[in-house]
Amino acid sequence: MIIPWQQLDPETLDSIIESFVLREGTDYGEQERSLAQKVEDIRSQLQSGEVVLVWSELHETLNIMPRSQLNAGGHAPY
């Protein structure tokens, strides 16, 4: 189930994004980016619709994933 990020308290959204960035350990190439920069990158992707917040009822977890990975019903494939 997609969770509308716009309806979350800004501090809650920041915490969710920060947790995701720390958990993912994404490689940003040759130049290391700060946590704040990575959080802003994800926030921009949420605003553009490139990624979405997804609640998994099966796993009872919240994740951020590319919109392109959702199935036709708008749900995560797990």
Swiss-Prot record:
- Report any Pfam family annotated for this entry: UPF0270
Q: Which InterPro entries match?
A: UPF0270, YehU-like_sf
Domain of life of the organism in this record?
A: Bacteria
What family is it from? Belongs to the UPF0270 family.
Per its UniProt record, what NCBIfam families does this chain match? PRK04966.1
Q: What is this protein called?
A: UPF0270 protein ECA4061
Source species of the chain:
Pectobacterium atrosepticum (strain SCRI 1043 / ATCC BAA-672)
Q: What is the lineage of its organism?
A: Bacteria, Pseudomonadati, Pseudomonadota, Gammaproteobacteria, Enterobacterales
